[in-house]
Amino acid sequence: MLHRIFKALAVVVGIASLGPWHAAAAGDALSFGVLSQRSAVLTAQYWNPVLEYVKAKTGTALALKVARTAPESNESIKAGGYDFVYSNTIFQPAMADAGYRVILRPRTEAIASHIVTLEDSPITSLKDLDGKVVGFPSLAAFVGYAVPMDHLMREGISVTPVFGGNQEGIMGQLKVGKVIAAAVNSQVMRAFAAREGVRYRILWGSEPFNNLPISVHPSVPGDVAEAVRTAIADMATDPEGMRILEETGKLVGQKPPYGFLPSSPDDYANYVEFYRTTLVKDIK
Amino acid sequence: MAQFRSPSWNRLPFVVRLMVTATIALLVAGAAMLFFSARQDAEDARSDLAGQLQAERETLPAAVAEVVVIGDFSTLQQILDRYVGRQSMASIRFQDASGVTLESVDAPITPVAPAWFASWMDLADVSGTAAVVVGGHLYGEVALTLTAQGAVNRVWRRLLNHLAILALAIGIDFLGIWLVLRQGLAPLSRLQDGARALAEGDMAKRIAPEGSPEMRRLITAFNDMAEATQRSQDRLVRARDDAEIASKAKSKFLSSMSHELRTPLNSILGFAQVLDFDRRQPLNADQKVSVDHIMRAGQQLLELIEQVLDLARIESGRMTISIEDVVVDSAARECIQLTQPHADDQDITVLNEIDPRMAVRADWKCLRQVLLNLVSNGIKYNRKGGRLTLRSSPSGPGWGRISVIDTGEGIPEDLRDGLFEPFNRLGKEGSDVMGTGIGLTVSRELTEAMGGRIGYASAVGEGSTFWIELPLA
């Protein structure tokens, strides 16, 4: 039907400088980047109420910024494009120059990498995957790609990776049988299985890693960063904050405890250690 | 319904009237169907547009939410471009809170329906907006416009299709009626031929029943009628033949009897005259009276016999008519001369107003006989001292009238029906006026034998006028 299109106008105000688009859209708002793990809509449905809450509590406007894919998120993180960021890729050596500093971590238990298959799959052990096609969320997924691939390489199991774009994507492919096994975030997979009614088998699990932290860019004033950290950390103890956390948590299939705790880079030292020793060289 | 009673409508052939009626019925029904169908289509289109607008407002935010959240304007533009490719979507525009605006406009749909039709449908473009809100955050607003032109075009095309179907139905209706009637009414022409044959005297003509049950019943009824007519005519022919035989026998009898009577009657009259004029032995007064009675009665009887013989000749067809140019005045003068003594006896003035130049096509003897009868009657039934006038006048193109006008007492209304009946003297049988009662009968027969007409007019107390009309020479 494109031939019928008479005119397609793109009146773009500031479209050439899409980097600060969120800021332009929200005036003086600080950007809040989220690693692309779920669909942008689901991500927005989860984070926008939280950011509105923060604004109400602190007066600091935070504009959600979601990239199309995790690598695009990482590119922005690497360039220091976000004022705040919800991601665990900041620990990659290549991101170190951006200088993001951890200020909050999830109250939930630490995540782990799981290599899973459907419960009725003929695959029963990791060795059965040798020479097989295995699904991963993306090259940027820490527990979804870097950790499990590092383990497979150390075990000498050669697999052909295919990528689903994000966690939801590869889990969807596993569900419909497009991949025989997938490497996933243990918590995300659990929520997906509960929501979609998928029964699966865990072939391997990694050591726990604290889930994605919220970090702040050095350019953000300290008082602002502290105010944001306090507001988010106190949500779990504030009835209104807890209501938001519960409602948004249900959207993505989270289990309690909801919310975040104040944190520091020490809580994520194993990330740094992993990146230092990993055999996987194509982590994004 | 006035046209169905008008003469011009009724003069149209049955097939034409049927076709016109069927066509009008189809046109009226078709027009009503088209009107209501188009109106319903317009209502449906209006409802569809509103429904589509509502559906787009409900689904569009979700469709663009992903790219709006990401801020992927190029993909958003592609989505908007795809949306304007949808049916009825004229334009779509997205504007975020900061004023960034993306818009896609479809090429205008070319109108195919005439302006009056679009105006009659009263379909307008519809517009609406929908907010793109995700997680309680307003990302922007989508404004969309649906054009009604496509719906107008569709309804117009459907109307044209319906018109084509209606035209096809009328065509099939025409063809069907024509074929059915041509085959169904074919027996009518044979029926017409049969009726014409009957009219021309072919009483044995019958039509083989064929066609529809109604036509078969009609043909059977025609045959029954022909059968009855034939039987009736056979009876009439037999009756006529019997009557002619009887008439001829009567005429023959009368002729014979008249001849047989005339011979002795002439002897009686002859000897009576001898007695009356015998100078050697003159009659005394009583004898004179008796002989006068014998002579008067004999003359009356002789006149009667002559008239009867004339009538018998006419009825038997033995009367020879020779049509020629006859000067009426000469015939009239001769009649006046013959009857003048009787007129003088009654002191009646006879006036001849016949145009001396007037000539008619007639048999001279017959014309003289007719005029003689009329003049004789005019004198006999006139009043003493009265007047009798013979007058000529034109009577229509090519015809002339000869009138005999008396000043008698006229003919009473109740007696006029028997005026031309033989031997009917209209109550004068017992009077002292002598007559046979068949003069007018003979006059009528003779006049009609010459191709003319006879008639009269009478006023009681004033007199009567008898006339004949004959073709002018």
Which residue stretches match the model-derived regions?
Chain A
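A local structural motif
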Residues: 55-65, 153-164, 198-200, 280-284
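Hydrophobic/proline-rich hinge and linker segments of small-molecule sensing/allosteric domains
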Residues: 102-125, 213-217
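Short loop->beta-strand "edge-of-pocket" segments that line small-molecule binding or catalytic clefts
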Residues: 28-37, 43, 127-144
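Short helices/loops that flank or line small-molecule/ion binding pockets
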Residues: 71-85, 97-98, 127, 168-183, ...
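Extracytoplasmic small-molecule ligand-binding "clamshell" domains
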Residues: 26-90
